[in-house]
Structures are given as structure tokens and as C-alpha cells.
From Swiss-Prot:
This is Tryptophan--tRNA ligase. The lineage of its organism: Bacteria, Pseudomonadati, Chlamydiota, Chlamydiia, Chlamydiales. A motif ('HIGH' region) lies at residues 12-20. GO terms for molecular function: ATP binding; tryptophan-tRNA ligase activity. Belongs to the class-I aminoacyl-tRNA synthetase family.
Length: 346
């Protein structure tokens, strides 16, 4: 059976949180354990440089790579089933990114909304947009097509990136002959989780995240401060359940559905205190996180396991990358010149 290749991953900007679990990790585990798919998970450290260029930020990337690795392995990403690789360790990505940049009209890139959103989140004004940030979607296309991925799991906010990738693949194949598959978008049921402050999706930069590695007391404290219904000033005031982060989290992480429905009824009637509902949520989230925390501590204590997992996956991706670039060189006609140069230098 020919497996469909899947490519997805994370920028190493720090530890992963419940938003990552809901938005991507659950889906990745399903794909990894499905025999129809061959999964490649990229730690996209080059992409981190598009918005984090200060020396102190760059110096943290190395430790963040191991944070992501430890989190991935602790939740069940298996290096025996999936290739986990480091983007910057694949030399071919730099060349393919350059070649694709020659084929991509600037207006196609500037029409992608996520570029300006990334700039806003990083407090970068439009006049200061770097070439690397503007070209971020082209580098992402190079990641996808270098791996010859058939499927790319993304949320709606990143669909335009995959559409650009399809356009680049079509353009290259039309001009130079067929090399690249045109990847399809693969969407999960949920793509984001509201932050604990009720303001937008959970993220490190917004300081509204519960991390997979947070200890029990930290989880309790974050949930104690969680945003609920601002109009509910007393426990006897009927509260709003819909859109309330407290109940969104209960629906996702409390497996006792009858209890959750009872909480909702009492909350709407003004017959229960926020503190009681929050305490139960903290209990359930801590029960949910306990296995991850235990496994993570084991991996952190044995960093060689993390290093071996990354090396194994990176070597697999290097092999794929070499094969892809050999096809690219052949179709472009560059390989003939390079071979003659190599032959004359011997």
C-alpha cells in the first residue's frame, strides 16, 4: 500500500500548551497511528527567525527545540513511527526556498493575511517587514514540497499557505516537468482553544496558556484566575455558559458529562459558585496532564533519547531531500553543469 505522506510541525518558541493539544497534537497522534499515512514532523527553527531575531531570542532556540521534543514524545509522538526532524539541519531547504522565490509573484505572498498578523503579534510595523517574514510562506512551501507531502494539516488561518504551495508546485511542474505532488489540506475537528483570559486563542505571547508541563499548583492558580462571565458579580447571579472559557474547558477536559451538564444548569440558575466549578476543572486537567508530566520528566532526565529521536528523523528527511533535489536539478538542467564541474575538479 502506498502511504500518503503528511507534513506538519511547530516553531520552537517554547513549551507546548493545551491549545497545541486541541489544535494539532490530537490530530497528529491519529495520523501517526493510521497505517495509511507516513508522518513527518518538522521542528521549524528557521521559521522562528522570521519574528525573533534579537540575540537573546536566538540563543533560546536551542533549548526550545528540546522543549518541543520533550513535549512531543511525552504525549505519544513516536520516533519509531514518525520522522521528527530539525528544519535547519536540512541543507536542501535553503536551495529549494531560493528556487521557489524566483517563481512566486510578490503580490501572491502579500495577499496572505497571516503575514501581517504575525507582524502584529511580534510588534513589527509594515515598514519594517523583513524579506524573511514576507517570504515565510515560500519557505513553508519549500518545507512541504521538499518532503513531497500529500497532506498538510492546517487551520483555516493557514489554508492560504497550502494554496500557495499548490500554485508553486503547479508552476514548477508546468515549466520544468513533474516533480512535486500538489498537497491537499487536512483539517481536524478543532483548530484552536480560547485562552484562559477569554481574549483570543491560547498562546505564549498572550500569557493565557496552560502548558502541558505545568505542575499541579500552577494549573490550579491559572484556572482560579480564569476569565468567566464578567456580568456575574455574585454566585446567586445567573451566569452565561455559552462562550464562557470555564465551560469550554469542562466540555473538552472533563470526561464526566453528566456533572458538566449539572454545572451548566446550576450556573445558569445562579446556584453554584465559580470557585466550585473551577476547582473541579483544575482536578480534571491535572488528571489529564499527569501522564504527560511523568513521561516528560523521564525524557528530560535522559536527553540522549531526545537527541537520538531527532537525529533518526533528520537523517530520514535528509535522504528524502536529496532524492527530491536530484529530481529538481535534473529537470532544471542544472545537474549536467554541476556534474561537469565535479568531474573536472577530480
Amino acid at each position: 500500500m502506498n502511504k500518503k505522506r503528511v507534513l506538519t510541525g511547530d516553531r520552537p518558541t517554547g513549551k507546548l500548551h493545551l491549545g497545541h493539544w486541541i489544535g494539532s497534537i490530537m490530530n497528529r497522534l491519529q495520523l501517526q497511528n493510521d497505517p495509511r499515512y507516513d508522518c513527518f514532523f518538522i521542528i521549524a527553527d528557521l521559521h522562528t527567525l522570521t519574528t525573533k531575531t534579537r540575540k537573546e531570542e536566538v540563543l533560546h532556540i536551542d533549548s526550545h527545540i528540546y522543549d518541543v521534543l520533550a513535549d512531543w514524545l511525552s504525549v505519544g509522538i513516536d520516533p519509531e513511527k514518525s520522522a521528527i526532524y530539525l528544519q535547519s539541519a536540512i541543507p536542501e531547504i535553503y536551495e529549494l526556498n531560493l528556487l521557489f522565490s524566483m517563481l512566486t509573484p510578490l503580490n501572491h505572498i502579500m495577499g496572505i493575511p497571516s503575514i501581517k498578523e504575525m507582524a502584529r503579534n511580534a510588534s513589527i510595523n509594515e515598514e519594517s517587514l523583513s524579506h524573511g517574514l514576507i517570504g515565510y510562506p515560500v519557505l513553508q512551501s519549500a518545507d512541504i514540497l521538499l518532503a513531497k507531502a500529500h497532506l498538510v494539516p492546517v487551520g483555516k488561518d493557514n489554508e492560504a499557505h497550502v494554496e500557495l504551495t499548490r500554485d508553486i508546485a503547479k508552476t514548477f511542474n508546468r515549466l520544468y516537468g513533474s516533480v512535486f505532488p500538489e498537497p491537499d489540506i487536512l483539517q481536524g475537528e478543532l483548530t484552536s482553544l480560547v485562552g484562559t483570559n477569554g481574549q483570543g486563542k491560547m498562546s505564549k505571547s498572550a500569557n493565557n496558556a496552560i502548558y502541558l508541563s505545568d505542575d499541579e499548583k500552577t494549573v490550579q492558580e491559572k484556572i482560579r484566575k480564569m476569565y468567566t462571565d464578567p456580568n456575574r458579580v455574585h454566585a446567586t447571579t445567573p451566569g452565561r455558559v455559552e462562550g464562557n472559557p470555564l465551560f469550554i474547558y469542562h466540555d473538552l477536559f472533563n470526561p464526566h458529562k453528566e456533572e458538566v451538564e449539572e454545572f451548566k444548569t446550576r450556573y445558569r440558575q445562579g446556584c453554584i459558585k465559580d470557585v466550585e466549578v473551577k476547582a473541579r476543572l483544575a482536578e480534571e486537567i491535572n488528571l489529564f496532564l499527569n501522564p504527560f508530566r511523568e513521561k516528560r520528566s523521564e525524557f528530560v532526565a535522559q536527553p540522549k533519547i531526545l537527541e537520538e529521536a531527532l537525529q533518526k528523523g533528520t537523517e530520514k528527511m535528509r535522504s528524502v531531500a536529496r532524492e527530491t533535489m536530484e529530481e529538481v536539478h535534473n529537470n532544471l538542467g542544472l545537474s549536467r553543469k554541476w556534474r561537469s564541474i565535479l568531474a573536472s575538479s577530480k
